[in-house]
Each structure stands twice: as C-alpha cells, then as structure tokens.
C-alpha cells in the first residue's frame, strides 16, 4: 500500500511498526480517488481524519499491514 501511494506522489507517514497507522496526507478532495482505488485493489479499510502523526493535517489512515 505504501508504495502505491508514494508512486502517485502522495505523502505517506508509516507508524505501523510502532503500533500506529499508515497515514496518507492530503485533503479528502485531493486524495479520495487514490484512496478509493487502494481500498478496492488491496481490500483494505480506513478512515479520514487528522492526528498527531500528521501534525494534525488532514488525511486518511489504515491499520492494514499490507
């Protein structure tokens, strides 16, 4: 998943090795096309939000280990 988002030029923050999430940083309107494709392609789930990991910037996150 990480490589997919990086390949389309989206900032990725990966905290899964410390029990966190994989964050995709961006406004929902800008990243939803890629998120929807990843959800379908990799059969993952996640949610939109903002958190400490992103410096409280908007994005989408998943706990998937794919």
Language-model regions: role of each:
Residues 1-66:
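Accessory DNA-engaging acidic/polar modules
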